[in-house]
Amino acid sequence: MFSDNRMHARLAVPRYYTGGSFHLIDGERKYHYIRANDVSIEGVGLDVPSSIERGAQVKVCFTSEGWRADLDGTVMWCSRADRVSGVSQQAYPNYRVGVRLNPGNSQDNALLYLALKDGLEQVRQQA
């Protein structure tokens, strides 16, 4: 059984979250409009179409109406998690990565977490 020993609670992000978009920059590679699985004040779990090396320095960007965050981080882990989609039902490459956000930007990291938390609460209230 999986044991989660994280210091901070993770906020699950719904698959089709429309309150903002995530982007990841890994050197010359840029991944736009990628899925975020979860967010905490210290990290983000993302889906990307190719592997990223553990220890890579990346930038996580989040944009929503009237707000943008550009946060530096380090890839802590990357694992293949192919998905099946579409009529053909063929798997396509997908990698889940865990990014630890730079603790030197703790205020901006917390703002990202709070913005998502507020956005998700608004969606629940409207449902």
Placement of each model-derived feature along the sequence:
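N-terminal helix initiation/capping motif
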Residues: M1-I41, Y113-A127
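Short, conserved beta-turn/loop elements at beta-strand boundaries and strand-helix junctions
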Residues: I41, W77-V84
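Short conserved beta-strand and strand-loop elements enriched in small hydrophobics
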Residues: T18-L24, G55-A69
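Short, surface-exposed secondary-structure edge patches
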Residues: D47-S51
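Short coil/turn motifs at beta-sheet boundaries
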Residues: R10, R29, V39, E53, ...
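Short beta-strand-centered aromatic/proline hotspots
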Residues: L71-M76
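C-terminal output/interaction extensions
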Residues: R83-A127
